[in-house]
């Protein structure tokens, strides 16, 4: 087995002033020993309890995310596991930290009219630390569920790094490179990737393994997602595709 993945990373050149060079690609190498796949907020698209609410908010974005999980993210995770890359799930939660007294809770209540403590309660947590209940959103199905050897980190804001154990886990694993997938691109995945860069992790996002929250009457379908992909390529890291990643995993594992 080869010990290194090689992927073409796309980025955007915002120079020279007044005449940007635009998109470019370069070969990026990822040692298996210091690379992990980061999976942000993917839940079971077919889990019965997930049909009442989706973190993707709009019907269009929810529909697109379900297709992406089934057709693109699952093969990516299967490929990563097959060559021994750590797979790290980052998921919403409701810790007992008086979130209702926070500006974050107020903003979510005003924009989505949801009680985060109730929305993200779980029935398999310590009720002394987390809000215990039967969440109607944090459910997995056979396609999306973490495997026994995967890692699982709970978060309670958009960023998977804020007040969590994620950075500790990555440093203990010796990770320097993150292959990122999940949702929503303009919220939790985006915030997590920004915080990863600030902590000196190199970020590669699989651009067909994510989607943004697109608003009816404001965003033509796909436009806000496309703009955010370009933003990632301008200011956060690089992008590639699920097919390229899966093919490279197959090559490395052969």
Model-predicted segments: where are they?
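Active-/binding-site microenvironments in catalytic and ligand-binding cores
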Residues: 70
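Active-site-adjacent betaalpha module
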Residues: 1-36, 43-54, 63-66, 75, ...
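A short, gly/pro- and small-residue-rich
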Residues: 57
């Amino acid at each position: 087995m080869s010990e290194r993945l090689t992927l073409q990373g796309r980025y955007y050149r915002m120079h020279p002033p007044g005449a940007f060079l635009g998109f470019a690609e370069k070969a990026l190498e990822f040692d298996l020993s210091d690379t992990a796949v980061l999976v942000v907020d993917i839940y079971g698209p077919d889990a019965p309890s997930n049909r009442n609410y989706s973190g993707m908010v709009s019907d269009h974005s929810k529909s697109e995310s379900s297709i992406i999980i089934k057709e693109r993210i699952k093969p990516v995770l299967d490929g990563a596991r097959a060559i021994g890359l750590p797979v790290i799930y980052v998921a919403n939660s409701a810790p007992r930290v008086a979130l209702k007294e926070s500006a974050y809770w107020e903003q979510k209540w005003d924009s989505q009219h949801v009680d985060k403590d109730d929305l993200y309660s779980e029935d398999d947590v310590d009720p002394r630390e987390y809000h215990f209940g039967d969440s109607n959103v944090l459910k997995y199905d056979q396609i999306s569920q973490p495997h026994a050897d995967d890692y699982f980190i709970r978060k309670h804001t958009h960023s998977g790094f804020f007040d969590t154990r994620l950075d500790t886990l990555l440093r203990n694993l010796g990770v320097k490179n993150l292959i990122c997938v999940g949702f929503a691109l303009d919220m939790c995945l985006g915030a997590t990737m920004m915080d990863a860069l600030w902590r000196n992790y190199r970020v590669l996002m699989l651009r067909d393994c994510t989607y943004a929250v697109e608003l009816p009457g404001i965003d033509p379908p796909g436009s806000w997602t496309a703009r955010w992909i370009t933003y990632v390529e301008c200011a956060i890291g690089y992008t590639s595709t699920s097919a390229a990643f899966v093919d490279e995993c197959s090559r490395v594992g052969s």
